[in-house]
Amino acid sequence: MKYSLFTVSVPEMTLEEAAKKMQEYGYDGVDWRVTDIPTDPEILKEAPSYWKNNYCTVDINKVEEQAEEIKALSDKYGLEINALATYLDCSMDPEKIESCMRAAKKMGCSRIRVNALKYDVARNYTEIFAEAVAGFKKVEELAKKTGIKADFEMHMGTITASASAARKLASYFDPKYIGVIYDTGNVIYEGFEEYKMALEILGPYLDLVHIKNAQWVKKEVDGKEKYV
């Protein structure tokens, strides 16, 4: 088993600071966070945060041109690039998805994250599911073309919150090209199935496991006790 750190978790560190710390703690690899870098001056004034002003982020618009630089940085600290963790989903611009795959190939990285679609109460699940299948058919073709696998994450609020739902979608595709990220924290919020059973359900589609802390906490909300 190998351990990798997803850099969303260290928003206060630069790429090099994080890589150095990972080496110190004995990590095998790194999942680089890849998305748009904020340009809003107000956001840039904010303290580092997971989702907004995250210093440990690779700009998705420059990821191809910076691929060799990022690989050199990872190599410097003895880190395998385990994944490029994008926030793209299967319905988004295929060129942007392919660009990230090309960047991954240059880095010697075998996979990128491309997520499934969010559930929308204003739409029918069957319609969203069909759209996701159509989207991942295009993603699978890009994976075959580039040799880079695309994984989608089990995530609350999406149509793949549980292992069963994730397997249903993944089963339309070759596990060589489309895989699933089992997220132990996300299933606490939504989609929990007994751990061993969940892994058995995912079978050959299970590609990565995210480990993080999550729990329900009782709080008083509007004068009532609720779990949040």
What does each model-found stretch correspond to?
Residues 10-11, 89-92, 120, 157-158, ...:
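Glycine-/small-residue-rich active-site loops that bind phosphorylated ligands and cofactors
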Residues 38-42, 120-125, 188-190, 219:
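A short acidic, helix-capping loop that chelates divalent metal ions and anchors anionic groups
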Residues 44-48, 97-99, 127-130, 166-168, ...:
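Short low-complexity, flexible loop/linker segments enriched in glycine and/or proline
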Residues 1-114, 137, 144, 175, ...:
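N-terminal pre-domain/capping segments
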Residues 19, 138-228:
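Acidic/histidine-rich catalytic cores of soluble enzymes
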Residues 7, 86-88, 116, 152-156, ...:
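Short glycine-centered, acidic/aromatic-flanked micro-motifs in structured strand/loop junctions
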Residues 122-135:
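Active-site cleft segment of glycoside hydrolase catalytic domains centered on the general acid/base Glu
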Residues 104, 109-125, 146-159:
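Active-site groove signature of glycoside hydrolases
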